[in-house]
A protein has these predicted regions:
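Specific aromatic-rich, kink-prone transmembrane helix
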Residues: 99-102, 119, 138-155, 162-166, ...
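Transmembrane-helix motifs of polytopic, lipid-linked glycan transferases
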Residues: 84-108, 145, 345-349
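Membrane-interface anchor segments at the N-terminal boundary of transmembrane helices
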Residues: 80, 84, 282, 289-293, ...
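Short hydrophobic/aromatic helix or loop-helix immediately within or flanking a transmembrane segment
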Residues: 37-48, 58-80, 90-91, 137, ...
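Short helix- or helix-capping micro-motifs
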Residues: 14-20, 113-124, 128, 140, ...
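Membrane-proximal stem/loop segments at transmembrane-domain junctions that anchor or position
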Residues: 233-314
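Loop-to-helix entry region of an early transmembrane alpha helix in multi-pass inner-membrane enzymes
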Residues: 11, 62, 66-70, 78-98, ...
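Membrane-interface transmembrane helices that cradle and orient dolichyl/undecaprenyl
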Residues: 1, 110, 146-165, 191-198, ...
Length: 409
């Protein structure tokens, strides 16, 4: 197949990805879009357009990272137009399809890339979820693009430039969802080991390029938060999220239901003295409230180490299980399982193919993502939407497995 024909096919696949996502969203209608959404993101976007401000209220000035609200503001201009969001996020989903192609092509070959792109274009969870009013679709694209750039560093003609691009894209992903933070040190280790044949000076250039670009992208937001809330931090949400995942009520609703319902149950179980402490923390400001929740979570972990360890396993199981978390209706579950289960099984075949060829670098890169996500999930919690960005790498591996099966036939 010629390169030109391959690009035409890839363009068709990306167009199908865009059309499938947009069509699915329009079919469900505007009412469903606003009802099944995280409305605070759009509130932030409107505030950004109207006031050039990311403070939703006095206690949420650094609670959410800025990239997705900024994306919504750019897409809608602050107008309550769900079609504009649907179009913009369908384009994001098409971009993820192109990244899946790039990864599978690098790890296997161009045929595997086209298969991975087609699978991503029609992957049921992505088709249904990429246009939801939440950051998942944008985060999936940002991480996939960063991973593709990172994977290119060892073979790039100018690895330092490729590392700069990878670091910058990783920073953008963290400004979309800060839970990617544990991946950064793993990526640095991968870069060092992935260029073992290169001179030490070249390896240090790649590492410094990645880390430097990451810091440059993150620093404006960090400095803004230092000025606004008095702390150099990506988010003041860590404490509450840690507490939601580490208290006696964590599994009162989660994972069958939303972690928000478990957090509500935990809040209702607070003693009057604890409620008074929360009031005092609120009076001191956003970071003090974050610190209070963080301290309560660590106190629970210290008092119940065995229970915490068992809970970590349960959280990981819920995140990677074939059932949606939180649970949905039977039809939604069947549609989700029809994509996720085959992708996971075929990914094992793709990983085996790489291992037989001693291509350890892609496996290590995928493993770094899984480990980083696993650490965050074990310490905090995760719904299916938080894990779904990993499915791009499982699908890329699945593309390699499917092309291998075809060759055997």
């Amino acid at each position: 197949m010629t390169e030109r024909r391959r690009l035409v096919i890839l363009g068709v696949i990306a167009s199908v990805a865009f059309g499938a996502r947009l069509g699915a969203r329009l079919a469900r209608g505007e009412a469903d879009f606003w009802e099944q959404s995280y409305g605070f993101y759009f509130d932030l976007a409107q505030k950004l357009v109207a006031e050039r401000d990311f403070c939703l209220d006095a206690l949420r000035c650094a609670y959410w990272t800025p990239l997705y609200p900024a994306f919504l503001a750019l897409a809608t201009g602050g107008a309550r137009c769900f079609e504009a969001v649907a179009v913009a996020q369908s384009l994001v989903g098409a971009g993820t399809t192109l990244c899946a192609y790039g990864l599978a092509r690098r790890w296997f070959d161009a045929r595997a890339g086209l298969v991975a792109a087609a699978l991503t274009a029609l992957y049921p969870y992505f088709v249904a979820h990429d246009t939801a009013l939440q950051e998942t679709g944008l985060y999936t694209l940002a991480v996939a693009a960063a991973t593709l750039a990172l994977d290119s560093v060892p073979t790039a003609r100018r690895p330092a430039r490729a590392a700069l691009l990878a670091g910058g894209l990783t920073g953008l992903a963290m400004l979309t969802r800060p839970s990617l933070l544990p991946f950064a040190p793993l990526a640095l280790g991968w870069l060092w080991l992935g260029r073992r044949g290169a001179p030490a000076s070249e390896r240090w250039k790649a590492l410094s390029g990645y880390a430097g670009a990451l810091c440059v992208v993150l620093m404006p937001w960090l400095l803004r938060n230092a000025a606004v809330v008095g702390r150099l931090t990506l988010t003041t949400r860590i404490g509450h999220s840690l507490w939601a995942g580490n208290n006696p009520q964590t599994f009162s609703h989660y994972p069958q239901g939303s972690i928000d319902r478990s957090a509500e149950a935990a809040w209702e179980a607070l003693t009057p003295a604890e409620v008074a402490e929360v009031g005092q923390a609120i009076a001191r400001g956003e970071t003090a409230l974050d610190d209070w929740f963080r301290a309560r979570a660590w106190a629970y972990v210290r008092e119940h180490p065995g229970r915490t360890l068992a809970a970590a396993g349960r959280k990981l199981g819920a995140a990677f299980w074939w059932r949606l978390n939180p649970a949905k209706g039977r039809r939604e579950q069947l549609v989700y399982g029809s994509g996720y289960v085959p992708a996971m099984l075929l990914a094992l075949g793709g990983a085996w193919r790489l291992a037989r060829r001693r291509q350890w670098s892609p496996l290590a890169l995928c493993g770094a993502h899984v480990v980083a996500f696993g650490l965050v999930t074990a310490a905090f919690w995760a719904h299916t939407s938080h894990r779904s960005y990993l499915d791009v790498y499982f699908i890329a591996l699945a593309g390699g497995a499917l092309t291998s099966l075809r060759r055997r036939e």
